[in-house]
Amino acid sequence: MTAAALASLYGLNIDQIEYAAEIAMEHNLGLTCDPVKGLVQIPCIERNAVAAMRAISSVNLSRFLFSTRKISFDEVVATMYRTGKDMDEKYRETSHGGLAQIYYAN
């Protein structure tokens, strides 16, 4: 949504705004939520900082590539939902998988 807000602030048209949101969201599909020691510092807060930079890049891409787009924002949202449903429960903010598991193993 940050990408869409930035695109709007930059005066892009509605198609470019939607495309900015689509680009930003599609590059976050399938991310695990595996907080180390049950805290949100790693990886969540760091991930938000990276996502903010990605939002800026998404706006720039949407400005120049919107006429070539193939996937809609709605398709990305539906895919994110399906991906989340398919994801193993241990990667859903439980600290039982991913980075959290590696940290406790060391």
Language model features by range: what are they?
Residues 1:
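Glycine-rich phosphate/ribose-binding loops and adjacent secondary-structure elements
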Residues 4-106:
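Functionally critical mobile loop/hinge segments
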